[in-house]
Design a protein with these regions (language model features):
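Feature captures the catalytic ectodomains and active-site-proximal regions of enzymes
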Residues: 1-385
Length: 385
């Protein structure tokens, strides 16, 4: 009997373009394969053991004869390709009415709302990665004290202010108010408060990031687990991506290794329910991304050795982020899924699954909660024999 599920979602863990990726300009996206090619191969022995080499050909990764985990890949049926859409679908909510708000930048009407609430003129309003926005607008920001604003070209806008110019609490509150005002105006968008530190030309993200998001438009696995009396713990930005709904408690740590440490620590404190962690392992430079991914792989045995008989571990992603492509933005890709447990089957090919909502259905079935409206559980495939 499964008593506890550990769900690790790696931000940007793509493994090849989805059939509709061309509509998003992502038909060439293949995050992990291109990363491996760029750095001369990846050393991921623990993901390799779980079955990574069976999901896709990756330089440096072998296809094991007897994988220790079950493996497959997940597609996404929702429109969009950002973290909100990805995590909502992983939780059992497919969004088909999503309108891309910031395809050409943040619209003027939205900018008027944002600048009214911030109380200052902003600079930027470009489609960019964080590193690019901070590099290009950092010197002007330090000189003018104007907040930097940018978008992912989808449905997220980021607001960055140096810690010496606005307190983290003030920045978070203003972004919370922006999200509410835009929601009241009928705009569904994620607003990210990102404090920064450093000197002109070398600004970098600091602690205190918060993501302000509307609640999911449907029933999630968190809702039904909460309703059934299960404990639901959020680590990283998981809590923010659901506007807190359905979580018992959250720990807003954004360093991937700190988040992983939090999960390890909870194994001794949380006896049942769901531990849901987000891990950002794809910084915007190829060598740093490969280093982060390999460091995560080396830490997996620390998790596995602490598992109990009734534990189930699921490792997957929320979208791709092919750093070899221009822009270094989220990409429309399949994500791998790996499942392991001390007492369940090994080496089962879970196949190519149409929707990431299958993860949610598996989690609620494993923890004996009510069935969700969408998704097919793969729990039966995990049973030994």
């Amino acid at each position: 009997m499964i008593n506890r599920v550990i769900l690790l979602v790696i931000d940007g863990f793509g493994i090849g373009a989805l059939p509709d990726a061309g509509a998003y300009g992502d038909d060439q996206a293949d995050t992990i394969r291109h990363l491996a090619d760029a750095v001369g191969g990846l050393s991921l022995p623990n993901l390799e053991s779980l079955g990574l080499g069976h999901v896709a050909p990756i330089k440096g990764v072998r296809s094991m004869a007897q994988p220790s985990g079950c493996f497959g890949r997940l597609g996404f049926s929702s429109r969009g390709k950002d973290s909100v859409v990805g995590h909502w679908e992983l939780s059992g909510v497919i969004v088909n009415d999503e309108t891309t708000v910031c395809r050409s930048g943040i619209p003027a009407a939205m900018m008027a709302v944002i600048e009214r609430i911030v109380g200052r003129k902003t600079i930027g309003n470009t489609i960019a990665s964080m590193a690019t926005a901070l590099r290009e607008y950092g010197p002007s920001h330090v000189t003018t004290k104007s907040p930097i604003i940018w978008t992912d070209g989808d449905n997220t806008c980021f607001l960055a202010v140096h810690e010496t110019m606005m307190s983290t609490a003030d920045l978070q509150q203003r972004c919370r108010e922006i999200r509410k005002a835009l929601k009241d105006a009928g705009v569904r968008i994620r607003v990210v408060a990102q404090p920064v530190t450093g000197e002109p030309g070398a600004l970098q993200a600091s602690k205190g990031r918060r993501d302000f998001v509307s609640e999911p438009p449907g029933l999630t696995m968190l809702d039904v687990l909460n309703r059934s009396g299960q404990i639901t713990m959020g680590i990283g930005k998981a809590y923010d991506l659901f506007s807190g709904r359905g979580f018992t408690k959250s720990f807003a740590v954004y360093s991937p290794m700190a988040a992983f440490d939090e999960v390890i620590g909870m194994l001794n404190k949380v006896p049942r329910g769901l531990l849901y962690a987000t891990l950002d392992l794809f910084p915007e430079e190829l060598t740093r991304a490969s280093t982060a991914l390999e460091a995560f792989d080396r830490r997996l045995p620390d998790l596995f050795e602490k598992l109990r008989v009734g534990d189930l571990v699921i490792v997957t992603g929320d979208h791709g982020r092919d750093l070899s492509l221009p822009g270094k933005m989220p990409t429309r890709e399949y994500v791998p899924v790996f499942v392991t447990s001390p007492k369940l089957a090994q080496g089962v090919d879970l196949g190519s699954r149409q929707t990431a909502a299958d993860v949610a259905q598996t989690v609620v079935e494993a923890l004996r909660a009510e069935r969700l409206p969408v998704g097919d559980s793969f729990l039966d495939a995990l049973r030994p024999g």
